Amino acid sequence: MKIIKNIFNKIDPHFQKGGKFEKMYPAYDAFRTMAFVPSHTSTSGAHIRDAVDLKRTMITVIIALLPALFFGMWNIGQLHFSAIGEQFTLMEAFMFGFWKMLPMILVSYGVGLGIEFAFAISRGHQVNEGYLVTGLLIPMVMPVDVPLWMLAVSVVFAVIIGKEVFGGTGMNILNPALTARAFLFFAYPSWMSGDQVWISGLSEIDGVSGATPLADLASETNILELERYSYSISDMLFG
């Protein structure tokens, strides 16, 4: 870590006021404070000097999100393999979901942080760290089969309209992740609603769900007759 810190100390003057990269200071500061605790303190009032800043707080929130993210990845895989009738292990289901989610997470962070850096540099203020959490929440609330370009457009709308126009992190009245989902719902409703079931790479699967099976279930008077659908009471209760 000392080597990395020496590198930052060496290039630091180029990003300070009067340096040739002065305008890029917000981007430089974002990377430096991600690696090391900021050296500055608040200007007034009672405060305690410690290593917990907004970046570290956001990292804590990300760690809290990981169990839900990992479960979602596994669930994507197990629903896929169950629908096509194949045997699978826990790791196979998890890795299937992992490779489906990874591009979405990369696009979300790439587009969102790019906008955050652009706004910070143009305004001359520090990069808002709030998107570290938002960038993970947006893929988690989106359909797994949404095209990446739609995801990117939703991220642009959420960050600019749902956040930056209000002043950035802490001043927005809209939740950026839900704003992205709402935008996609109204702009491309066919991707967000309907009775189509997602099964990766397969369209010929029949009988998983849909309007007809659900209508048949709703019209049954004897719960025992539901056994012909291979739905147990526990399946209907817990999913």
Model-assigned labels for residue ranges:
Residues 67, 71-74, 111, 115, ...:
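Lipid-exposed faces of alpha-helical membrane segments in multi-pass integral membrane proteins
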Residues 136-146, 162:
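Hydrophobic alpha-helical transmembrane segments and adjacent interfacial helices
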Residues 104-118, 135, 155-163:
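Central hydrophobic cores of alpha-helical transmembrane segments in multi-pass inner-membrane proteins
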